[in-house]
Amino acid sequence: MSDFLPFSRPSMGDAELAALREVLASGWITTGPKNQALEAAFCQLTGNRHAIAVSSATGGMHVTLMALGIGPGDEVITPSQTWVSTLNMICLLGATPVMIDVDNDNLMITPDAVEAAITSRTKAIIPVHYAGAPADIDAIRAVGERHGIPVIEDAAHAAGTHYKGRHIGWQGTAIFSFHAIKNMTCAEGGLIVTDDDELASRIRSLKFHGLGVDAYDRQTHGRAPQAEVITPGFKYNLADINAALALVQLEKLSHANQRRTEIAQRYLRELADTPFKPLTVPAWDHQHAWHLFIIRVDEAACGISRDALMEKLKAMGIGTGLHFRAAHTQKYYRERFPEVSLPNTEWNSARICSLPLFPDMTDDDVTRVISALRQLSGR
């Protein structure tokens, strides 16, 4: 059997090793100049005013929601078709996640669904840019503006994603992820961009103990030896070891996403006559980052269930992923919100399968995946 082909693998090389050696030799390995450089680079990438690096996108979501004052009695609109961390943070703050359905073919929320879910208790809207494609953010933001409700873009899948000619996060507030499987990674990490000066200040304080400075300010520059706690906060700062990796990965992002696009286009072409149906790319002007390539495996059409297909591919040495099992079908949310019914989300959640997609895949790797799927489809 050939070596196992994972569904994702980080692309690391000599440049990343050199960046790590530089930080280790510097004498300062936690939050410091590499963080500052990463934040400046993301302001340049997105065109937004503020960037705050954090230890994870989950931590970023936590402090952003808290900085907006969201708590008990409040509602936050979110898809169920997302990673559970968003809903977990909403619940941990004492607020209520209002889960809405997604478009059946691109798996992103629509402005109409958002509008229908708004109540007097709605305090935030969280659209997800899914699998590397952008949500229709202008239309969703317009709904929020009509009602005076802030929009927090979940851009965990959107490093390199463009919408109508501009990088996701060019205005408003967006949260990126640098987790190990993302288009750019530093193992664990995230970053918030925002054009709201006061929100940026609150987030920056909350992510580091509620202080008005970070570790680099306190211990290296000595600017605030008597720094005070402004409000109780957390420890979500990003180490410079991670930030150094992220900076190198950001330099490689365009080239890496180009390779992802080449692989995705092959999948689209060479699986077109099989019963495995990919997500539909959005109709609005965009540049897809192809974080994931997802097919829907409908047993009635394919002659095999999604779970059985994943097992057979695993036996053939090919890894797959599931992004995601709908949050409202998981134990805690199923028991707390038994009334939630989201037909499009539920149909897709039971059928979606993420195929191998990462920049270091060879053409032979891609051929291997396509051949296995064609074999399993009887084509």
UniProtKB/Swiss-Prot annotation:
It catalyses: UDP-4-amino-4-deoxy-beta-L-arabinose + 2-oxoglutarate = UDP-beta-L-threo-pentopyranos-4-ulose + L-glutamate. Catalyzes the conversion of UDP-4-keto-arabinose (UDP-Ara4O) to UDP-4-amino-4-deoxy-L-arabinose (UDP-L-Ara4N). The modified arabinose is attached to lipid A and is required for resistance to polymyxin and cationic antimicrobial peptides. One of its GO terms (molecular function) is pyridoxal phosphate binding. One of its GO terms (biological process) is lipid A biosynthetic process. NCBIfam families: PRK11658.1. This is UDP-4-amino-4-deoxy-L-arabinose--oxoglutarate aminotransferase. It comes from Klebsiella pneumoniae (strain 342). Pathway: Nucleotide-sugar biosynthesis; UDP-4-deoxy-4-formamido-beta-L-arabinose biosynthesis; UDP-4-deoxy-4-formamido-beta-L-arabinose from UDP-alpha-D-glucuronate: step 2/3; Bacterial outer membrane biogenesis; lipopolysaccharide biosynthesis. InterPro entries: ArnB_NH2Trfase, DegT/StrS_aminotransferase, PyrdxlP-dep_Trfase, PyrdxlP-dep_Trfase_major, PyrdxlP-dep_Trfase_small.
